[in-house]
Design a protein with these regions (language model features):
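Histidine-acidic metal/acid-base catalytic patches
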Residues: 2-4, 15-22, 98, 150-165, ...
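Acidic-and-aromatic substrate-binding clefts and catalytic sites of carbohydrate-active enzymes
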Residues: 8-16, 32-46, 69-72, 108-112, ...
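Charged helix-capping and loop-helix junction motifs
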Residues: 42-47, 77-85, 115-126, 179-188, ...
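Alpha-helix-loop-beta-strand connector modules within alpha/beta enzyme cores
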Residues: 48-66, 121-135, 218-225
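Conserved radical SAM core fold
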Residues: 65-69, 106-109, 200-205
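Hydrophobic faces of well-ordered beta-strands that scaffold small-molecule active sites
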Residues: 3-9, 28-30, 59-63, 100-102, ...
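N-terminal pre-domain/capping segments
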Residues: 1-93, 256-257
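Active-site acidic/histidine proton-transfer and metal-coordination neighborhood
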Residues: 71-166
């Protein structure tokens, strides 16, 4: 069975972190900021992709998200988002990535209860990306961020209904923002869940603590994951090496079940 586990690595640190990743057999989820995509040389992306492939390590990618929104009503914001996401898929292709995580841009306070405004724009935005991703053989996953309930993401994914566009369940964001128990979230979106983001908090801030160091019930989460028809890949979103090592230890018992 293929290794499902990845670890968060910013693009700016990836080349210097490669020896550590290869030595430990850790697969990166490469996180890009917008300016990274303007500056990253194609040759560097190709070289890193080849090095990881030669080591037998798979790659996932996290797209930039600051100030971007694929459901934006403002055409200039939508165009900036389109440009960055196209750059992200190009970088992912050079790295040999087979999955890219995107933020959906939904914030209920922005739309004043008129979620259909965001949904209508998102339904127009994603089809060209689905076509491109299918040609690259690269899946895309929309991550829950501020969603209190599943319908915004569930409705979008159901209407687009593509095997190349699924859901990334971020357990830290769910614990912080969602009003539903994890089994109800998975009842709505489990069949479309293809990736997980794993980090911990106490329900007060997006702390990105190592797995097991906050108040999230990871046993309940992995109970839901174990019932899925296909096991999702997953990324530990630790933001420094000591936290990563503790998170690896924290998640290990759930990966051997």
């Amino acid at each position: 069975m293929s290794n499902p586990l990845h670890v968060h690595v910013p693009w700016r640190l990836l080349e210097s972190t490669l020896p550590f990743l290869i030595d430990r057999g850790l697969q990166p989820e490469v996180a890009f900021q917008g300016p990274d995509l303007d500056r990253a040389p194609a040759a560097s992306l190709d070289n890193v992709g080849r090095a990881l492939g030669a080591a037998g390590l798979a790659v996932t990618v996290h797209a930039p998200f600051h100030d971007l929104n694929p459901g934006a009503l403002e055409p200039l914001v939508a165009e900036a988002t389109r440009r960055r996401f196209l750059q992200t898929l190009e970088a992912a292709d050079r790295l040999g990535a087979r999955l890219v995580v995107f933020h959906p841009g939904y914030e209920r306070w922005k739309y004043g209860g008129r979620d259909h405004l965001w949904l209508e724009q998102a339904l127009r935005f994603w089809p060209p990306f689905i076509d491109l991703a299918s040609r690259q053989g690269c899946a895309m996953a929309l991550e829950n961020v501020f969603e209190r309930e599943p319908p915004p993401l569930a409705n979008l994914l159901a209407q687009l209904d593509s095997p190349f566009l699924g859901h990334c369940f971020d357990v830290g964001h769910w614990h912080l923002f969602c009003s539903l128990p994890v089994d109800e979230w998975f009842f709505a979106l489990g069949s479309r869940t293809i990736h997980l983001h794993l980090h911990d908090n106490f329900g007060r801030a997006d702390d990105h603590l190592p797995v097991g160091e906050g108040s999230i019930d990871f046993g309940a989460l992995f109970g839901q994951v174990g019932a899925l028809a296909a096991r999702p890949s997953m990324t530990l979103e630790a933001h420094d090496r000591p936290a990563l090592l503790r998170s690896l230890a924290g998640v290990a018992p759930f990966l051997v079940r």
